[in-house]
Design a protein with these regions (language model features):
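A broadly structural signal marking compact, well-ordered functional cores
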Residues: 1-2, 106
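Alpha-helical scaffold segments
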Residues: 2-13, 45, 53-54, 92, ...
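Primarily a LysM-type cell-wall glycan-binding module
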Residues: 8-33, 55-81
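LysM (lysin motif) carbohydrate-binding repeats in extracellular/periplasmic proteins that recognize
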Residues: 22-50, 73-101
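Generic detector of short, aliphatic-rich beta-strand segments that form the cores of beta-sheets
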Residues: 53-61, 99-106
Length: 106
């Protein structure tokens, strides 16, 4: 019972859920399904290789992930989401953005 309580409190505290990888799943696909990024899933689960079939991972649901539009630029995104350019680059471990990129804007 203690493990269940710990799991429940972690899920509530971090607004996350568990996802079990199924045949055909990819990190990119699962990240898109839960409106997050592959990088967030890898870091949150300390993954060093792709999840195996049947492996459960924690998924932090984030409303702070956007898809960069064709006409978007970093300054416009910063204004729209009240974010700092350096912080967006740091969170995403990138030095530039491009259209259709999934971007953490926290």
């Amino acid at each position: 019972m203690r493990g269940f309580i710990l799991m429940k409190s972690l899920i509530e505290e971090f607004s996350c859920g568990a996802y079990v990888f199924e045949k055909g799943d990819t990190l990119d696909g699962v990240a898109e399904k839960f409106n997050t990024t592959k990088h967030v899933i890898i870091c949150d689960n300390n993954l060093t290789s792709p999840p195996l079939l049947g492996q459960a991972v924690f998924i932090r649901r984030s409303e702070s992930v956007i898809t960069v539009g064709a006409a978007d630029d970093i300054d416009g995104i910063c204004r729209k989401y009240g974010a700092q350019k350096d912080e967006i680059y740091r969170l995403n471990k990138v030095n530039f953005i491009y259209p259709f990129m999934r971007l953490i804007v926290k």
